[in-house]
Amino acid sequence: MKFAVIQFPGSNCDLDMLHAIRDSIGEEAEYVWHAETSLAGFDAVLLPGGFSYGDYLRTGAIAKFSSIMPEVLRFAEMGKPVLGVCNGFQILTEIGLLPGALIRNNNLHFICKTVPLRVANASTMFTELYEEGEIIQVPVAHGEGNYYCDDETLLKLKENNQIVFTYDSVNPNGSRADIAGIVNERGNVLGMMPHPERAVEEIIGGTDGLRLFESVVKAWKEEQVNA
């Protein structure tokens, strides 16, 4: 399986993503610069964390207009897996692949720590190797991670089982309904503020993020068999 790691000016978690795919799960991964216009040959897209375009105007607002974005939209429409982490999640909301928005943390400070997450939906292509309700430990590092949506959108997310991860015990940023990660209605686009790519080795704090990437590979291989 081959992953595309999209690089924007200001990305800083792209190397972590590449390491997680190549070294931790042994799959192929390549950088794709934001000015490219093709994702031919790739099976999954990863939008990494960081500060794309310096977070000017608004987080993800300028990245929305990158040349690669129409191809990311087309990729998602084909049902292929797209994962946006932290700034990547912010970009996914900006381009309309996911509902809602990420706003300033309610304490107005940058937060960098490991937090407990509850797996709220273990039936997606990103979470099938987790147990429903399982508590995992994954780092967060953001200043605008406070997920917001209106009441109608929140109700729809709940009814469609689109809330994949929630903060457990402590909500670090004020997100509505403790939301840490959501999928689109089709289930092939996941946006999350915590960084699973930083939780793939015991030596740096744990491996609870590893199964997310392994789940994607498992789902992809099953699809190839059934194709």
Curated annotation (Swiss-Prot):
It comes from the Bacteria. The keyword Hydrolase applies. Its EC number is 6.3.5.3, 3.5.1.2. Residues 2-226 form the Glutamine amidotransferase type-1 domain. GO terms for cellular component: cytoplasm. Pfam families: GATase_5. GO terms for molecular function: ATP binding; glutaminase activity; phosphoribosylformylglycinamidine synthase activity. GO terms for biological process: 'de novo' IMP biosynthetic process. SMART domains: GATase_5. Pathway: Purine metabolism; IMP biosynthesis via de novo pathway; 5-amino-1-(5-phospho-D-ribosyl)imidazole from N(2)-formyl-N(1)-(5-phospho-D-ribosyl)glycinamide: step 1/2. It is found in: Cytoplasm. Keywords: ATP-binding, Cytoplasm, Glutamine amidotransferase, Hydrolase, Ligase, Nucleotide-binding, Purine biosynthesis. Part of the phosphoribosylformylglycinamidine synthase complex involved in the purines biosynthetic pathway. Catalyzes the ATP-dependent conversion of formylglycinamide ribonucleotide (FGAR) and glutamine to yield formylglycinamidine ribonucleotide (FGAM) and glutamate. The FGAM synthase complex is composed of three subunits. PurQ produces an ammonia molecule by converting glutamine to glutamate. PurL transfers the ammonia molecule to FGAR to form FGAM in an ATP-dependent manner. This is Phosphoribosylformylglycinamidine synthase subunit PurQ.
